């Protein structure tokens, strides 16, 4: 999130759900904590440096890729970055931009677990 109450989102460059919206993220590497993984993934996909990663919640997920079904645990974090003005789409992201919370439509996000996570996040923001 930036100071204008906008959420950083990506457009997926690859399948599954190529071309749809997503949140920066990915799989955790072996021996990596959730905080380390989200910090690395945000840098790989946006070039942004995470200074703080605050764990919010997790959701069980089934992820199908290349014909394989993988059971995962999706972890959601609120991240603070050192600079919200300089970023670029890299790695798995075709585009990256800030989207005002009021303009977020969960159906624009291609992965069901991300849609569900956003619904939880947005409900909490309304409180």
Q: What is each stretch, according to the model?
A:
Residues 1-22, 50, 81:
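N-terminal strand-loop-strand
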Residues 86-127:
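Nudix hydrolase/Nudix homology domain
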Residues 9, 76-78, 98:
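Conserved hydrophobic/aromatic beta-strand scaffold that supports enzyme active sites
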Residues 16, 62, 105:
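Flexible, glycine-rich phosphate/dinucleotide-binding loops
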Residues 28, 50, 59, 81, ...:
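Hydrophobic pocket-lining residues within nucleotide cofactor-binding pockets
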Residues 23-56:
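The catalytic Nudix box helix
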């Amino acid at each position: 999130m930036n100071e204008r109450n906008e959420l950083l989102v990506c457009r997926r460059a690859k399948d599954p759900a190529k071309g749809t919206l997503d949140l920066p993220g990915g799989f955790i590497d072996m021996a990596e904590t959730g905080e380390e993984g989200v910090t690395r993934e945000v840098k790989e996909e946006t070039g942004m440096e995470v200074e703080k990663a605050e764990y919010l919640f997790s959701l069980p997920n089934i992820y199908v890729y290349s014909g394989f079904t993988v059971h995962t645990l999706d972890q959601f974090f609120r991240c603070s970055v050192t600079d919200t003005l300089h970023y670029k789409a890299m790695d798995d992201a075709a585009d990256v931009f800030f989207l005002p919370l009021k303009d977020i439509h969960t159906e624009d996000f291609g992965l069901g677990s991300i849609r569900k996570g956003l619904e939880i996040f947005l409900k909490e923001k309304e409180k």
